[in-house]
Amino acid sequence: MNADSKAPDFLVVIPARLGSTRLPRKPLADIGGKPMVIRVAERAKQSLAHSVVVATDSPEIQAACDEHRIECLLTSENHPTGTDRIAEVAQLLKLPANALVVNVQGDEPLIPPKLINQVARTLAEHEQCVISTVAVPITDAAEINNPNVVKVVLNRSGEALYFSRAPIPFVRDPQSSQKTMHLRHLGIYAYRADFLQAYTRLEPASPEQAEALEQLRALWNGYRIAVHTAPEAPPAGVDTPEDLERVRQLLARS
């Protein structure tokens, strides 16, 4: 039996907003004749998700989804984070407390469907956790000290101890560095629906604000995060015009 056939029942939500500083109107950027958010939704539909929903505060994005027959929910303009937007979707859809919701970023048109299945499976397998996510081994030493690369340290059960932009774990003795595996966090998450509602009631945590990493709010409040360690990173998402051109060329060749 294919491992993916064992994936649990889950829903994919894709938060999408037009406000992007580095790439204006990013979700609607054209990639081979389709808006990027539609490309992301089509990749998500190749996963084992029972449904895929775009969550947006933009009527333009909603119109693009309608044109391409992608389910879309118009949400509040006042959400401070994508997680808050997903929580509203869970509420609008009246999801049961134990439902699994996978958050796929709207700028990941090359995300592997198997990775979506895996993050859902990881949460299903860790019943004591309320969130799951993914990390990959860092192979470029320069990334360890790069604050734009978020690192994560795990316990022996594969749960997150801490996420940071700092080099963690810090290697005090260079001779032991070869035995130390640094992990890069990837921004894909699965949540239990009841936790999403609890999350919106939590105050921002001081480590979260210092690092600008919203997942630290969960750890700060005693919630547990399961982390799947994948062998290698998936294709990078789209943050800049250069990224957009790279993705266009890749999809044109496929």
Curated annotation (Swiss-Prot):
Q: What is its main location?
A: cytoplasm
Cellular component annotations (GO), alphabetically ordered: cytosol
- Known InterPro entries for this protein? Cytidylyl_trans, KdsB, Nucleotide-diphossugar_trans
Give GO MF terms, alphabetically: 3-deoxy-manno-octulosonate cytidylyltransferase activity
Q: What class of enzyme is it?
A: transferase
Compartments where located: Cytoplasm
So, what pathway does this thing act in? Nucleotide-sugar biosynthesis; CMP-3-deoxy-D-manno-octulosonate biosynthesis; CMP-3-deoxy-D-manno-octulosonate from 3-deoxy-D-manno-octulosonate and CTP: step 1/1; Bacterial outer membrane biogenesis; lipopolysaccharide biosynthesis
One matching Pfam family is CTP_transf_3
Keywords on record: Cytoplasm, Lipopolysaccharide biosynthesis, Nucleotidyltransferase, Transferase
Q: What is its EC number?
A: 2.7.7.38
Q: Which GO terms describe its biological process?
A: CMP-keto-3-deoxy-D-manno-octulosonic acid biosynthetic process; lipopolysaccharide biosynthetic process
Q: Catalyzes what?
A: 3-deoxy-alpha-D-manno-oct-2-ulosonate + CTP = CMP-3-deoxy-beta-D-manno-octulosonate + diphosphate
Which NCBIfam families does the protein's record reference? kdsB (TIGR00466), PRK05450.1-5 (NF003952), PRK13368.1 (NF009905)
Family to which the UniProt record says this protein belongs: Belongs to the KdsB family.
The task this protein performs is described as: Activates KDO (a required 8-carbon sugar) for incorporation into bacterial lipopolysaccharide in Gram-negative bacteria.
Protein name per Swiss-Prot or TrEMBL? 3-deoxy-manno-octulosonate cytidylyltransferase
Q: Which species does this protein come from?
A: Polynucleobacter necessarius subsp. necessarius (strain STIR1)
The gene that this protein is the product of is: kdsB
